[in-house]
């Protein structure tokens, strides 16, 4: 079973929490680390329990808190190489061990959660 919770949605910032039996992930981190922590705490999720952050694209309303939350809680980040290259202000602050690339249309796993990324033209 999957649980979803939209933490933030809109032009000011986007972040989605997804939970499976063994995985807890954030899809985008478009608000500050502090606001994302508060939102997670409000749904009784410990931010240090997050297994991964998936980045959909490099717009500020999707990555604002990326480097801070990844660094603070030592959370691996997953994105395409092109997305990483387009957000150097964020990625330069990430621990190298937490940088993970994926390719569109190639599934991968985060714990028991299968992820199948795709591109939208």
Please state what every model-predicted region is.
Residues 15-16, 57-59, 108-112:
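Short, solvent-exposed polar/charged micro-motifs at secondary-structure junctions
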Residues 18, 28, 57, 77, ...:
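Divalent metal-coordination and catalytic microenvironments
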Residues 34-83:
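Active-site metal-binding motif and surrounding structural segment of the metallo-beta-lactamase
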Residues 3-6, 30-32, 53-56, 117-120:
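Short, flexible loop segments at the rims of nucleotide/cofactor-binding pockets, characterized by
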Residues 1-43:
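Conserved beta-strand hairpin/beta-sheet module of binuclear metal-dependent hydrolase folds
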Residues 14, 23, 49-51, 71-73, ...:
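A generic structural signal for short beta-strands and their flanking turns/coil linkers
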Residues 81-121:
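Metallo-beta-lactamase
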């Amino acid at each position: 079973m999957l649980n979803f919770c939209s933490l933030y949605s809109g032009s000011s910032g986007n972040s989605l929490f997804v939970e499976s039996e063994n995985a807890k992930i954030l899809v985008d981190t478009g608000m500050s680390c502090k606001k994302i922590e508060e939102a997670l705490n409000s749904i009784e999720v410990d931010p240090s329990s997050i297994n991964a952050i998936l980045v959909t694209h490099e717009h500020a309303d999707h990555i604002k808190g990326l480097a801070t939350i990844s660094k603070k809680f030592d959370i691996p980040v997953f994105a395409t190489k092109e997305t990483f290259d387009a957000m150097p202000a964020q990625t330069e602050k990430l621990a190298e061990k937490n940088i993970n690339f994926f390719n569109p249309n190639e599934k991968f796993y985060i714990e028991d959660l299968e992820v199948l990324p795709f591109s939208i033209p």
